[in-house]
């Protein structure tokens, strides 16, 4: 998929580029039965307090209902369309099953309109098919991986992401994740064959602040530009140093390289090699 790079007709255009959606998107309006609207929370919780900073505004979006479970076994589905989804970096594929039901799935790289996909133990090893890990050959590239059988895919779902099935030992399969982490997952968990599409997403340059605002992302202010009451880095005369042994979050916790994973987590025993 190509990238359109704009000529510098204005300061905002100078560094901007966009994906050439016409090359892959085949349908502009979502399937009505598979969307719903949701109130914007702007990073607030049910008490109205900000729990996620730098959120708010942005273009109105409809939420697409995506099938991460891939539990409709043994029924072939035809790819009707490849669609854009404003809520994620990957594209969606609209499937029409032989019994007439329609579902969205993450569109893998190479999946085209007219292709047939299937899920279940009897599915072939081809792009877009979903199977339990025990039926997938070692060395296969996979995405949309479950951590618990039946819960639905939780790992490797963003644009261009791919994991590899490295080995099978007893009840567990060893998977190498995009982060470099090696971890065991139950062989009963499902995964989808192939790599998530939209590989060029990482090469797009936003170009201007306003484009981030369209996405619902607000400015991030440096702590050193604040007052001491607002941030541990704040205050001082001119461009003062941090004044601490290392950088801190707004709440005084160490940051930038500080490990935040909970100690002695029960799932630690499944991680063979920590992420990079």
Curated annotation (Swiss-Prot):
Origin species: Caldicellulosiruptor saccharolyticus (strain ATCC 43494 / DSM 8903 / Tp8T 6331)
Stretches for region Disordered: 223-276
Q: What biological-process terms (Gene Ontology) are attached?
A: cytoplasmic translation
Subunit-structure text: Part of the 50S ribosomal subunit. Forms a bridge to the 30S subunit in the 70S ribosome.
> What protein name is recorded for this chain?
Large ribosomal subunit protein uL2
Q: What is the lineage of its organism?
A: Bacteria, Bacillati, Bacillota, Bacillota incertae sedis, Caldicellulosiruptorales
Gene3D superfamilies named in the record: 2.30.30.30, Nucleic acid-binding proteins, Ribosomal protein L2, domain 3
What does the protein in this record do? One of the primary rRNA binding proteins. Required for association of the 30S and 50S subunits to form the 70S ribosome, for tRNA binding and peptide bond formation. It has been suggested to have peptidyltransferase activity; this is somewhat controversial. Makes several contacts with the 16S rRNA in the 70S ribosome.
What InterPro entries does this protein map onto? NA-bd_OB-fold, Rib_uL2_dom2, Ribosomal_uL2, Ribosomal_uL2_bac/org-type, Ribosomal_uL2_C, Ribosomal_uL2_CS, Ribosomal_uL2_dom3, Ribosomal_uL2_RNA-bd_dom
